[in-house]
């Protein structure tokens, strides 16, 4: 069953991603992603690692697209999921609480976009305490704590798409670290087997042919 579920899916880490510490990142990312979302006629989750990115992308999509843009926080979680499932051509832009425990099956969801690897913010008090404890025990906090936790969270995000044997689609992860850093392979190995590309035009062609 696992192989049948996975073989139909595509994973894309786009080329030419905007530099993450630039003020124009949000607009550039919106410009890059909107043609893909429109090629898929919505049916998309955009999972963000910050509220700033969530609100910014939602605003951009609403300004530039005729698709129905649903945003976490504007109504209850249950209502948002109901609207997403039963409203054609919907895009749900959300953050942490939508990374797990969500079950949307079939054609309603066929594209999941993740803005970057979901590392916990370094100023998180609980993470700070765990890092300090790890250091005291002679450990490596990044490899022992931060990477494993982010891997689990990413798997949950990708799992929004692959829920049943008939589900298929595309996952786009907008983070060059997946292919530029040594630890990127750890993340990739944790995900379901799928064909991979860095070419968004190929993704658009794939979605238009579905």
Predicted regions and their residues:
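ASCE RecA-like P-loop NTPase motor cores
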Residues: 3-4, 8-210
């Amino acid at each position: 069953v696992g192989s049948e579920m996975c073989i139909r899916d595509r994973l894309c880490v786009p080329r030419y991603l905007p530099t993450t510490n630039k003020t124009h990142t949000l607009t550039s990312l919106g410009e890059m992603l909107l043609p893909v979302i429109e090629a898929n006629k919505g049916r998309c989750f955009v999972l963000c690692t910050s509220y700033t990115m969530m609100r910014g992308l939602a605003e951009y999509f609403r300004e530039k697209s005729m698709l129905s843009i649903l945003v976490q926080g504007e109504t209850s979680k249950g209502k948002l999921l109901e609207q997403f499932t039963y409203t054609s051509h919907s895009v749900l832009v959300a953050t942490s609480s939508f990374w797990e425990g969500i079950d949307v099956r079939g054609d309603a969801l066929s594209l999941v976009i993740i803005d970057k690897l979901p590392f916990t913010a370094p100023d998180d008090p609980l993470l700070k305490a765990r890092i300090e404890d790890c250091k005291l025990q002679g450990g490596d906090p990044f490899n022992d704590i931060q990477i494993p936790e982010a891997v689990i969270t990413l798997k949950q995000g990708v799992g929004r798409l692959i829920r049943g044997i008939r589900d298929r689609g595309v996952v786009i992860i907008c983070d060059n670290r997946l292919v530029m850093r040594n630890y990127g392979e750890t993340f990739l190995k944790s995900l379901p087997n799928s064909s991979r590309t860095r070419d968004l035009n190929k993704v658009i062609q794939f979605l238009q042919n579905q």
